[in-house]
Design a protein with these regions (language model features):
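Generic beta-structure capping elements
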Residues: 19, 30, 175-177, 408-410
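Flexible, solvent-exposed loop segments that connect beta-strands
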Residues: 178-184
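Outer-membrane beta-barrel translocator/receptor signature
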Residues: 1, 5-48, 59-60, 136
Length: 429
């Protein structure tokens, strides 16, 4: 009751939009502020969105959308030395809020109800867990449309490029005097940087052949490029109190990992219809991926589907059966795994729940490498899922009664056991 507050959330937004003769635009601003039930916790988020579209000529149009979001979160200390360990453990007879959290004249020596855990009030002032995220995503496009001066042909071509990029940074710090870090403090800085770029080209063609026949065809190309980076900094034993920073740590350890992968795909789709009664669709996609072994980086997956609407037949048009359809389909879906060439990494060792890390590299100016504990299969193939489906849909009495039946089956080929783990037995210094 004395420790917890009432959580509050405030949200504000502003939107301005206008339609012009051949253009439109929209601007949105937003903010969310949150105070947590623990006084040291909360969140602030700001977001901006801008979009615009314009018709350049009778055939050409263009537009863009851009979004930016920034989020800052102050979190409660968790894990083995969490805030609530002393809050819930203290009996009503112990005045946790009234007794000073530290010794008079020395703010880095705690008055602890439970000696193995930090005083909750002291921890709110000296231990900080934060999370900061900045994200930008958006796209820009250009499209071309024409009917070739006829009523039965239409062509629509569109090219769009987009990006989704974000960074998330975490800081988990225990101040000088905390029971975590041996009494001299500990800090972890870690996070992600991720940027995904997308290029998409589609060409859509509609042909109204005659009163009975119709045809639609789609061709396209897609390129996806993803760049990721993970970093980690760990430091212990601050030189002096009051500055929870990695540069204040006498012992430091850093790690960094980067990934890059690219997918290039070509796809097509052809659909034919007859009297709004018979439908046939063929699709196919060829993908080339970078995150597979060199000899298995391309794969093709097609599909075919057909439908027959029985109630379009004159003999079956009545007031009892409103709609009756038979459908059948076959499809393949390809899925690439995650493949890495074997490499070496710096080992890490745990010392148990209540002990410090026994060995930390670099040690006395020397680092160490061991074969990574995950072995990837050099013969890995893209996983292929084949599915078969047969079904029927029937509606009766103005859709008062409906019946639907589907039988489907899936078979997975080259199911990916992508990697196995083995004990690390060798080290190289």
């Amino acid at each position: 009751k004395d420790f917890f507050d009432t959580g509050i959330t405030w949200s504000n937004s502003l939107n301005v939009a206008q339609m012009l003769d051949k253009s439109s635009y929209s601007i949105s601003l937003g903010n969310t502020h949150q105070d947590g039930i623990i006084s040291s916790t909360g969140m602030d988020r700001y977001n901006v969105k801008v979009s615009a579209d314009t018709k350049l000529t009778n055939n050409w149009s263009s537009g863009f959308t851009a979004n930016y979001i920034t989020t800052s979160i102050d979190k409660a200390v968790t894990s083995g030395n969490g805030l609530l360990r002393t809050v819930y453990a203290a009996p009503p007879s112990y005045d946790l809020a009234g007794i000073p959290s530290h010794v008079d004249g020395n703010q880095y020596t705690q008055n602890s109800f439970r000696g193995s855990f930090d005083n909750a009030y002291w921890a709110m002032d000296n231990n900080k867990f934060t999370e900061d995220t900045n994200r930008f995503f958006g796209n820009v496009y250009a499209s071309y449309q024409t009917d070739f001066g006829t009523t039965n042909h239409k062509l629509n071509a569109k090219y769009m490029v987009g990006v989704d990029a974000y960074t998330t940074h975490y800081v988990d710090s225990y101040g000088y005097g905390s029971n975590t870090g041996g009494g001299r403090g500990q800090i972890e800085n870690y996070g992600w940087t991720n940027a995904t770029y997308n290029s998409l080209l589609t060409i859509n063609y509609d042909w109204h052949i005659n009163e009975d026949w119709g045809l639609n065809a789609v061709l396209g190309n897609e390129i996806i490029q993803s760049n990721r980076k993970k970093y980690y900094e760990y430091g212990t034993n601050y030189n002096f109190p009051g500055w929870n920073h990695i540069n204040n740590a006498t012992t430091q350890q850093t790690e960094e990992e980067t990934w890059k992968n690219r997918t290039v795909g070509f796809f097509g789709n052809v659909s034919a219809s007859y009297k709004n009664m018979l439908y046939l669709t063929l699709t196919g996609r060829q993908d080339y991926v970078s995150n597979m072994p060199r000899n298995n980086r391309s794969f093709f997956y097609p599909s075919i589907s057909a439908g027959f609407i029985l109630t379009e037949l004159d003999a079956l048009k009545n007031n009892v059966v409103n709609h009756a359809k038979l459908r059948v389909s076959y499809a393949e879906v390809g899925q690439a795994g995650d493949f890495l060439e074997n490499y070496y990494s710096t080992p890490t060792y745990g010392g148990g729940f209540y002990t410090l890390t026994p060995i930390m590299y670099p040690m006395k100016g020397t680092t160490a490498y061991t074969p990574y504990y995950t072995i990837f299969d050099p013969k890995l193939k893209p996983q292929n899922t084949r599915s078969y489906e047969v079904g029927a849909d029937v509606n009766f009495l103005d859709n008062l009664i409906t019946f639907s039946y589907t039988y489907s089956r899936q078979n997975v080929k080259d199911l990916s056991l992508i990697h196995i783990s083995e004990p690390t037995r060798r080290s190289y210094i």
